[in-house]
A protein has these predicted regions:
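Short beta-strand elements
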Residues: 168, 175-191
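A surface/secretory-pathway sequence property marking extracellular, secreted
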Residues: 87-133
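C-terminal segment of N-terminal export signals and the immediately downstream linker at the start
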Residues: 24-53
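A short beta-turn/strand-edge loop motif at beta-sheet boundaries
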Residues: 79-86, 99-102, 162
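Low-complexity, intrinsically disordered segments enriched in Ser/Thr together with acidic residues
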Residues: 125-164
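Short, solvent-exposed loop/turn segments enriched in Ser/Thr/Gly
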Residues: 53-72
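Buried hydrophobic-core signal for structured, non-transmembrane domains
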Residues: 71-76, 168-170
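N-terminal secretory signal peptides and thylakoid transit peptides that target proteins
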Residues: 1-17
Length: 191
């Protein structure tokens, strides 16, 4: 009779454990909550210099336009019967660049201009800018997701060269009267 080493037994147990866990019953309260998901591409351009004036500048763009699942926004974990309400995105941008003015671009006509928001919760070292979606949401039965009828696109120019830009993006969506939020942060570097 051959004996197995302890190592091969432990190795086999490690592979078997996930299969056992995968079949465990998950209680109903553990189901995922609705969320405003998607990809907003934040782009910090390389510094450029105006040939006439010699002034340096950097362009910062927030681009949510594109096709699912690579770009855009969508509400997940909400049934076809859900009511999707107030939706907004607040972009906290490092105060080292001063207060910015954004231009709306692309087909973001259902989004309010991304503008300074004095009512947003204060984040030390950041200035808040908020846009609100004023369009309608359409349910896609194939993906079981809700999609807005337009996607955000904003751009601004900073009148100097920037090599890093700390940002925090906070997303908020109301589903059946409850507000759900999601936040992501990072430091942008020129593309």
């Amino acid at each position: 009779m051959s004996q197995q080493s302890r190592r091969s037994i432990v190795k086999g147990a490690a592979w078997a454990a996930p299969a056992v866990l995968a079949t465990a019953t998950i209680p109903a309260y553990a189901a995922s909550k609705p969320a405003l998901d998607g990809w907003l591409l934040n782009i910090l351009s390389r510094c450029s210099r105006d040939r006439r004036s010699g002034a340096w500048s950097t362009t910062y763009t927030i681009n949510g336009q594109g096709n699912y699942p690579d770009r855009g926004l969508w509400v997940s974990n909400a049934p076809a019967s859900a009511t999707i309400g107030a939706t907004k995105v607040t972009q906290y941008i490092s105060d080292t660049v001063g207060q910015l003015t954004f231009q709306t671009g692309g087909t973001s006509n259902q989004w309010s201009p991304l503008a300074y928001d004095s009512t947003a919760p204060v984040r030390n070292g950041y200035i808040a800018y908020t846009t609100t979606f004023k369009g309608t949401w359409q349910y896609n039965a194939t993906n079981k997701l809700w999609f807005p009828d337009s996607l955000p696109y904003f751009t601004t120019t900073v009148g100097r060269c920037i090599t890093t830009l700390p940002v925090i993006t906070a997303r908020f969506v109301t589903v059946n009267g409850t507000v759900y939020s999601f936040e992501r942060s990072g430091t942008l570097r020129p593309a």
